[in-house]
Design a protein with these regions (language model features):
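Transmembrane and membrane-interface helices of multi-pass
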Residues: 2-232
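Short, motif-level signal for alpha-helix interfacial/capping segments enriched in acidic residues
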Residues: 43, 92, 265-269, 479, ...
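Conformational gate/switch positions in structured elements
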Residues: 66, 115, 142, 289, ...
């Protein structure tokens, strides 16, 4: 009797769960069919090289389909598992059926709409499209369905077929009866578990290293930027861009006047070092939190200050050093686009923004076109910070992370493999790359909680803040890296570029202001000793590395860049940073703050290095010329970003 009562209470619930799972499975099938149609219709643009590549993209697409399906089905899941006997009535079941069919039909319409729209944009639709076409006549969209009637009919047919199949799925036949406590308890457990799993699935994984899956993660599964749309689906693209800040379309001046003050098109080849290092390998070392403050050799004006980078101090004596180096951002996730592609964050990190699918001019891709092999090294768990996805978008062909290192005994317990161990791995692994090569390495040990291996805790200087010893550790790790690298046959034929991802406010008051917080070392080391010196006059930034490195190795083709080449003294030298909606422009001895509408501050960094005196209303300053240049810069940047024109030399405006 007890078993029968419990069964009569739980059997309808089991049928409801089975129906929910079958609906999820059907959704996966529908999304895959839409992806297949997308692929067939746009195969000429996708340029898929092999069946293996196609299979990988479809496999990767399931990850994004899962995220979209669980998010769009969250209401259905909740309503299906509510501990209510009324949820098994015929009327309630019809309501669930209607909800599921409406949501899935909308997904079909969105996905098939992008089958055609992709041919105009080469990316999935995001919420930016509603801003872009917000003022257009809505009947223009209806015309879209008429003009592409074949896809419209296909969509109608797919919706009808979907509804027929969904109608044949078995429904619960009865309401729960008997021991209702078992029904209520089991329903609550299933409801809570389903909501938790939905959040995890929508986020993209269980691990603490996993950030919410976003558009740029699709780059893991592709070979060409335009293929990303095949991996993604349109509901996911729309969901992931909800609430993402979009850039305003600045209209400070006619576009014809913009090049008078700033020209984003740059042609290398006119500096004394242009092409001097043609055919050289390039190793780019991105040092986590490598602030200028830590380097004694860059703070000789501070009496008695030694710093915490004795190796870097010695290396700078044999290098070319930009003493006025700046980061363009304050986060690691923003540094990668700036360093690799001269792309500043569009209010939010580029890789998390609605513009992350834009075409970019990237250093690895340009070098690849010149015959370079390309690799990226980062000792964190693969997928951390979305680096693997972005560097593939930037054209990197080989990725080496914690997975490839394959020795968890060297894991620091927080971020990844200790720098000392991983940099030795990098030095050895680089030798397997075909020359000429481009290899980038992103360190990680000088990061909170600023731990160092136990054997060095009593050896390395501790300084006054925990960060100091962590910096000293990475400096030591780099010394050992160069010792190993110097014994390799590729060493003398390599240019080494050392830059920070961002600065970190430390102990010195000189760096506790809006400009000091961005100051970083930028160092170019040539083992042959052909490039030695100090540039104490010109500004340099992360965004300058793209045009500068390409100029050094002999790429003389024009490019779009929002950085510059500090070796080129014919162009104005300035740096722009986005400080949470306030743009900071540093030019000469001045720092200008601008909120997009009005100037909020101007400081003379030479006479007022601590930025205590706002002189924006003082006459005789360079504010007018700086403001015109900044406005031209922002107007061109925002327009190119919004309309995916970051690679076009002469776009139609």
């Amino acid at each position: 009797m007890t078993s029968s009562s419990t069964s009569s209470a739980l059997t309808p619930l089991g049928a409801q769960v089975r129906l929910l799972l079958l609906r999820f499975l059907l959704s996966f099938v529908i999304y895959s069919i839409c992806r297949g149609i997308f692929c067939l219709y746009n195969q000429d643009l996708l340029e898929i090289g092999s069946a293996g590549q196609l299979a990988l993209m479809f496999w990767g697409g399931l990850r994004f389909d899962l995220s979209a399906i669980v998010y769009t089905s969250l209401l259905l899941t909740t309503l299906s598992l509510l501990p209510l006997p009324q949820a098994y009535s015929r009327g309630y079941q019809r309501m669930l059926t209607g909800l599921y069919r409406i949501v899935t039909s909308l997904a079909i319409i969105l996905n098939l709409g992008d089958v055609v729209y992709y041919r105009f944009t080469l990316k999935r639709t995001t919420l930016a499209v509603f801003e872009e076409f917000g003022d257009e006549n809505p009947f223009q969209f209806l015309r879209f369905f008429v003009d592409y009637w074949g896809i419209t009919l296909l969509g109608i047919g797919l919706i009808i077929l979907f509804c027929i199949i969904e109608g044949k799925l078995p429904r619960p036949k009865q309401r729960p009866t008997g021991r209702m406590w078992a029904f209520y308890l089991t329903s609550l457990i299933l409801l809570g578990g389903s909501i938790y799993l939905s959040i995890v699935a929508g986020r993209g994984g269980f691990t603490s290293e996993t950030r919410p899956i976003t558009l740029s993660n699709a780059n893991i599964y592709i070979r060409r930027p335009q293929q990303r749309a095949l991996v993604l689906n349109t509901p996911f693209s729309l969901i992931r861009t909800i609430g993402k800040s979009s850039l305003p379309e600045y209209q400070y001046m006619p576009f014809a006047e913009v090049p008078k003050y700033f020209n984003s098109v740059y042609t290398p080849g006119s500096t004394p070092v242009s092409g001097k290092y043609k055919g050289r390998n390039v190793v780019l070392i991105i040092w986590e939190s490598f602030a200028r403050e830590w380097v004694g050799g860059l703070n000789q004006d501070i009496p008695g200050y030694q710093g915490f980078t004795p190796f870097i101090d010695s290396l700078m004596q044999r290098s070319y050093v930009f003493t006025n180096g700046y980061s363009n951002s304050q986060k690691s996730i923003d540094a990668m686009p700036a360093i690799f592609a001269s792309v500043l964050k569009p209010h939010v990190p580029f890789v998390l923004s609605i513009y992350s699918g834009n075409n970019i001019t990237a250093l690895p891709a340009r070098l690849d076109s010149m015959g370079y092999s390309t690799a990226f090294f980062h000792g964190a768990p693969n997928g951390s910070m979305g680096f693997n996805a972005f560097v593939m978008q930037a054209g990197v062909k080989e990725y080496y992370g914690k997975t490839e290192y394959a020795n968890d005994a060297d894991y620091d317990g927080n971020w990844g493999i200790w720098d000392e161990k991983f940099l030795q791995y990098v030095a050895r692994q680089i030798g397997s790359l075909r020359q000429p090569f481009f290899a980038a390495e992103f360190t990680l040990s000088s990061h909170h909680p600023f731990r160092v291996p136990e054997e060095y805790q009593k050896v390395l200087p501790k300084g006054t803040i925990p960060m100091h010893q962590a910096v000293a550790y990475t400096d030591m790790a780099l010394r050992k890296f160069f010792e190993t690298a110097s014994k390799q046959p590729w060493y003398d034929n390599t240019l080494f570029v050392i830059v920070a991802d961002h600065a970190v406010p430390g102990a010195l008051p000189q760096y506790k202001n809006s400009t000091g917080a961005f100051r970083i070392p930028i160092i170019i080391f040539d083992p042959r000793g052909e490039l030695v010196g100090r540039d104490t006059e010109h500004l340099a930034s992360q965004a300058d590395l793209l045009p500068t490195i390409l100029d050094l190795v002999g790429d003389d083709k024009p490019m779009v860049t929002f950085g510059g080449n500090p070796f080129d003294t014919t162009r104005p030298r300035f740096v722009v940073q986005d400080m949470d909606g306030i743009y900071q422009m540093i030019e000469g001895d001045y720092a200008l703050h601008f909120d997009g509408q009005k100037v909020t501050a101007l400081y003379n960094l030479k006479t007022d290095p601590q930025q205590l005196h706002n002189i924006k209303d003082q006459p005789g300053t360079p504010l007018p010329s700086m403001l015109l240049r900044l406005k031209a810069y922002l107007q061109d940047y925002a327009w190119r970003m919004k309309y995916n024109k970051l690679t076009e030399l002469h776009p139609q405006r």
